């Protein structure tokens, strides 16, 4: 229970740090009165996408079989503006990417952890950070700086300066920013063909959604059984790793 509570507070703190960074960066980059930010001309596509309120999810990629028309039985996508939907998609893509890294790291770290003086035996991933901190007292401070740096870069790329007098200051994406596309592609893997780009983005969304469910399930399983996830799979499904 303590692990769950600490995890909840940790992620809440990360969310607050993320919001604070966006606000701070937005204030720092506000233009003086009388000047304007350069905006993308109307109807100019972002990665081949022109928003349309007549299409599912404003026309953003993500519709895959067996739901070729999109899956939203409760109609949530019909209740939000374009700006809000872009922000939700940005959040979904970002959380999905983090979850994919977390799911991979969760499994690998239990049997392969050569750093930080951890024991050579199999360890519980949910206990690994606590063990690391005993060896590296300032580990979480270093981790927080790393996360803040990544969030700072994302805020500089995609988030608009605040509108003074509104409630959601620093919580709006720029008009010419495509959700999730922060321009980080060192290997040049981003397709230039629109159809190929939409296909790969749909795959990323689906894998990210699965990873969010998967990492939640693995954490819950270890909290209940206190057994490394790979060993649990071996004992219950006869899998060998």
What are these model-predicted stretches?
Residues 1:
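Active-site or metal-binding loop neighborhoods of secreted/extracellular toxin and effector enzymes
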């Amino acid at each position: 229970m303590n692990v769950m509570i600490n995890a909840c507070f940790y992620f809440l703190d990360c969310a607050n740090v993320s919001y604070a960074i966006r606000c701070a960066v937005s204030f720092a980059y506000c233009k003086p009165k009388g000047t304007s930010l350069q905006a993308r001309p109307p109807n100019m596509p972002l990665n081949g996408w022109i928003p349309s309120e007549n299409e599912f999810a404003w026309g953003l990629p993500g519709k895959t079989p067996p739901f070729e028309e999109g899956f939203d039985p409760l109609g949530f996508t019909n209740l939000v503006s374009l700006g809000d939907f872009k922000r939700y998609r940005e959040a979904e893509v970002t959380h999905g990417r983090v979850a994919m890294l977390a799911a991979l790291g969760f499994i690998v770290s239990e049997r392969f952890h050569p750093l930080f003086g951890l024991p050579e035996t199999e360890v519980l991933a949910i206990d690994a950070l606590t063990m690391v901190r005993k060896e590296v007292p300032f580990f979480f401070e270093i981790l927080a700086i790393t996360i803040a740096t990544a969030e700072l870069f994302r805020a500089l790329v995609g988030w608009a300066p605040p509108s003074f007098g509104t409630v959601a200051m620093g919580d709006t994406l720029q008009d010419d920013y495509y959700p999730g596309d922060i321009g980080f592609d060192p290997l040049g893997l981003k397709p230039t063909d629109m159809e190929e780009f939409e296909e790969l983005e749909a795959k990323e969304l689906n894998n990210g959604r699965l990873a969010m469910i998967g990492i939640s399930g693995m954490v819950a399983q270890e909290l209940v059984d206190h057994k490394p996830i790979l060993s649990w799979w071996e004992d219950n499904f006869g899998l060998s790793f």
